[in-house]
Regions:
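Short amphipathic helix-loop junctions that connect adjacent transmembrane helices
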Residues: 39-55, 245-261
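Juxtamembrane intracellular "pre-TM" segments in multi-pass secondary transporters
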Residues: 3-16, 195-231
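Cytoplasmic helix-loop-helix junction between adjacent transmembrane helices
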Residues: 114-154
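Conserved MFS/SLC helix-loop-helix module at the cytosolic interface between two early adjacent transmembrane helices
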Residues: 70-109
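Helix-loop-helix hairpin linking two adjacent transmembrane segments in secondary transporters
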Residues: 152-192
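Helix-to-loop junctions at the C-terminal end of transmembrane segments
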Residues: 72-84, 276-290
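C-terminal transmembrane helical hairpin of 12-TM major facilitator-type secondary transporters
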Residues: 291-334
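Residue-level signature of mid-helix packing/kink "hotspots" within the transmembrane helices
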Residues: 66-74, 124, 157-158, 270-278, ...
């Protein structure tokens, strides 16, 4: 790794306080996202009584969300490389709040689709959060720090879906209002507490190529050692997005679960993820390299995903969640490998 990738003295380096700030911000962010997962398919179902149409429209809702995130992620990353991480993160928190309130007030499927486009674009600031962590962390500690960030994701999934399931039992739209309030809280937290991580001397100008998703992929592919990881990253992203997109529909139709039961199942997913990434990951990395951990994690996740598809009873889902401990480290391991190949001014694009 080049010297440019090292955190700048006096502005970067190991900054535990800044790490705590971004961890809280990410926790609130994913708590808000987790709130809506158990109830979003049912909200789509309010606009159509046909189960086949509900599934199709939910697929479009998920697709537009993911497409917006794909397009927006490099744009937000490039903007954060130019103007700093903090303003881009604040923009994302504001956009998420508007998205949640718009979804809660949607009166048609088209309004729901439009609000999810905004949500997908703003949720892309998760990439900026990763860049923030890279800015404030020495290279040798990044895998562990990315694991802590993943633990915040897990805790958000511990609390969010359970709260969403319980609130959804009162009213399907209530979780969206609560999620919007949390996003506003995150915005206020960021305005008054969150420090900037990228000093002015390490920023660079924004170019159209940097904001182009395909150009960003090509730039990543040119980084030493990352080109071979690109197919792996694509497959992992596709698998994870597909799993969480169909989770509620799958368990509802196969096991007859409602919002509360789905909330508890996602609670289990988040608990295991937080335990592994927040407590066990540092110990695991003392035994194996990030490269070897990535291979082990991918194998574990592959077996688990096949198991979900073959499960015939609801309790089997919980057993598979418990067995897939290593699978929860795949994101931190791969992100560490990619981040280690990028210079300090390119972290927003990783």
């Amino acid at each position: 790794m080049s010297a440019a990738a090292e955190p700048a003295a006096g502005t970067g380096g190991d900054r535990p306080a800044a790490m705590r700030f971004i961890m809280v911000a990410v926790l609130i962010d994913f708590l808000a996202v987790g709130l809506i997962i158990p109830v979003l398919p049912a909200l789509v179902g309010q606009f159509t009584a046909n189960p086949a149409e509900q599934t199709r429209w939910y697929g479009w809702v998920a697709f537009t969300y993911a497409a917006a995130s794909f397009v927006a992620a490099p744009m937000l990353g490039a903007l954060s490389d130019r103007y700093g991480r903090r303003p881009v993160l604040l923009l994302g928190f504001c956009g998420l709040a508007l998205n949640f309130f718009a979804t809660a007030l949607a009166t048609s499927l088209w309004m729901l689709l439009a609000s999810r486009v905004v949500g997908g674009a703003m949720q892309a600031n998760a990439a900026v959060a990763n860049a923030y962590v890279a800015d404030i962390t020495p290279p040798e500690q990044r895998a562990r720090r990315f694991g802590l960030l993943g633990a915040m994701f897990g805790i958000g999934f511990i609390l969010g879906p359970v709260m969403g399931g319980l609130l959804g039992g009162i009213d399907l739209r209530l979780p969206f209002f609560v999620a919007g309030a949390l996003a506003l809280l995150n915005l206020l937290y960021g305005v008054f507490v969150l420090p900037e991580s990228l000093p002015a001397e390490r920023r660079r100008n924004v170019t159209w190529s940097a904001a182009n998703p395909l150009s960003s992929l090509r730039a990543l592919a040119r980084l030493k050692g990352v080109g071979l990881l690109m197919p792996v990253l694509a497959c992992v992203g596709l698998a994870q997005f597909t799993l969480y997109t169909v989770w509620v529909l799958y368990t509802t139709f196969k096991f007859g679960w409602g919002p509360t039961q789905n909330g508890w199942s996602l609670f289990a997913v988040g608990t295991v993820a937080a335990l592994v990434q927040g407590v066990l990951l540092g110990r695991i990395l003392k035994l194996v390299t990030p490269q070897r951990l990535a291979v082990l994690a991918l194998c574990s996740a592959m077996v688990a995903n096949i198991g979900y598809g073959l499960a015939t009873e609801g309790w089997m889902i919980y057993a598979i969640i418990l067995m897939n401990l290593l699978g929860n480290t795949v994101g931190a391991a791969l992100q560490s490998l990619v981040s280690g190949a990028a210079s300090g001014s390119e972290q927003g694009q990783t």
